[in-house]
Amino acid sequence: MANSQRKILVTSALPYANGPIHLGHMLEYIQTDIWSRFQKLRGHECHYICADDAHGTPIMLKAQQMGIAPEEMIAQVQKEHEKDFADFNIQFDNFHSTHSDENRELASQVYIKLRDAGYIKTKTISQLFDPEKSMFLPDRFVKGTCPRCKSEDQYGDNCDNCGATYSTTDLIDPRSAVSGATPVMKDSEHFFFDLPAFEGMLKEWINSGSLQQEMANKLGEWFEQGLQQWDISRDAPYFGFEIPDAPGKFFYVWLDAPIGYMGSFKNLCNKRDDLNFDEFWSKDSTAEVYHFIGKDIVYFHSLFWPAMLEGAGLRKPTSVYAHGYVTVNGAKMSKSKGTFIKARTYLDNLDPEYLRYYYAAKLSSRIDDLDLNLEDFAQRVNSDLVGKLVNLASRTAGFISKRFGGKLAKIADTSLTTSFLAKQEIIANFYETREYGKAMREIMALADIANAYVADSAPWQLIKEEDKQEEAHQVCSNALNLFRILVTYLKPVLPKLAQDVEAFLQMELTWDNLDIDLAGHEIAKFKALMQRVEMKSIEAIIEASKENLQVTAEPEVKKEVKTPLEQDPILDEISFDDFAKIDLRIARIAKAEHVKEANKLLRLELDLGGETKQVFAGIKSAYAPEDLEGKLTVMVANLAPRQMRFGVSEGMVLAAGPGGKDLWIMEPHEGAQPGMKVK
């Protein structure tokens, strides 16, 4: 049991109830589930709740296309979501829906408190209106020609071709994506939440340590731009909750969606006698509330949500933790390449524990994107889980059953056990701070030690010698005890494996019994715990995902794609003497790390083979620091040092690409050596 039991409520962002879960979504639920399971393993009271986000125009229109009521559609989707989550071993304490009585009641209560306190304003606005469907059109339901690059069939708020953002009224030849009709402008009175009234409180809150520094920095930019009143209403027809005392007006989905956290917890409290809703959500609550979210919804969770809670007299979250996106094989998930993988497609072909481990091995507390490299995925799972972890038991358990009656020996030399147990607080701290990758590396380093011990001791040789039977018994028992400790450390990540190991060892794996003496303890006969990942299974997933595209994809509009030379024409000629002034050198990236004060920069220590230079490079959007260390690259070595507010930059690394994720540093041939001049 933990020294001081904590009361914790943890949430993941609510999946939208108009489609299936994919592997990008699963990152967040796996990350949160690991954290929740860890808290419970340590003896804390922890409740992991979630719900389907079930309101909005997209759901209303999709249900119409299917010829069913929205309520029927969201019920079907919720059933599919719950099955996917359960099969991925996501252990919610409650999974509900925002379209619920609890959420309707709480959303109305929050709104009325905000209204009565003077935080709700009204304003008449003009919007595009579909005259055939008699409905106002959200930006994404208006299409037309981009006013900048003239590409056709672009959305009402941004262009996929050139990346421009604009107002729907700027579109050329706009049309309704619902009916195809030409929209008209129409006035309507809307309700606004007075977000600027909470600016002082929000500035204090975001700098209180409740957010990652990267998030706090980003929010600081929004304050510089000035907070705006937030439109919280939508006009009928709309699938959602009607606003109290305002017929024909509905809550915008982003108002009742975060209240859905409270609604799901309220539903759980109604099912149980030992839970009190107010103990977690009242202004003076001492419980902890944590939200795990994607970086794309930081604005809603770190500005609107805490301001709404403050205005309604409720407590704010203890912390909001954001993560990055998932890429596959170094690129955005793609339906045409078969890398836009649904959770169910994965589950039809591979063990969910594989992905849980791979994500854990690459997750940190930062907001970096995570790349699911499918070859690396197979190699890492096969090496770490099958080759190191499970192999430890498979090499030794048979001897215990066949030669020693299935009973473990009293271990004379406990030095290895002591060294493994000495890591428990280090590993626990990594879990607590969401540094799962560091935890996995620590655990696998222990697995290497345990396997080396077995290899050096060679019980398969000892067992052949009559006078070495006790020594063989000791080695195998010691190995299985180390295996037990390792699986206990991994239990939040690999719950199904832990369950199978508990059946094999005939004991529960808990943090409290890590140091238990197993002398004389009887184990069951060993059965295979995990199979290797075969590339044919991965190939089957990719092929199945391509087939999904053929069934569901909409016809794509051909776009004129400019070549790199067209986008970035060659500059004016320079003389050879001008070029000769630039000293390009091979450098090895000795160290790479984040710059807390900057959103786009990484700090690099570049080894020139006898001299080290510090460079601040704007490549954070494309690279995680750990992926750069050890790589060779090319740098401008004689660039004048530049004083920046976080240090001096002594050069520049070379990279190609338009920017963002599409940026690649120059990597010379492996025969090149640090310090060599590029000629």
From Swiss-Prot:
Any one of the GO CC terms: cytosol
Keyword Zinc among record annotations: yes
Binding-site residues, ATP: 335
Cofactor: Zn(2+)
EC category name: ligase
Catalytic function, reaction form: tRNA(Met) + L-methionine + ATP = L-methionyl-tRNA(Met) + AMP + diphosphate
UniProt motif 'HIGH' region: location: 15-25
EC number(s) given by UniProt: 6.1.1.10
Motif ('KMSKS' region): 332-336
Residue stretches making up the tRNA-binding domain: 578-679
Record: residues binding Zn(2+): 146, 149, 159, 162
Entry-linked PROSITE patterns: AA_TRNA_LIGASE_I, TRBD
Compartments in which it is found: Cytoplasm
Gene Ontology biological-process entries: methionyl-tRNA aminoacylation
Free-text function comment from the UniProt entry: Is required not only for elongation of protein synthesis but also for the initiation of all mRNA translation through initiator tRNA(fMet) aminoacylation.
HAMAP family the UniProt entry points to: Met_tRNA_synth_type1
Subunit structure: Homodimer.
Protein name according to UniProt: Methionine--tRNA ligase
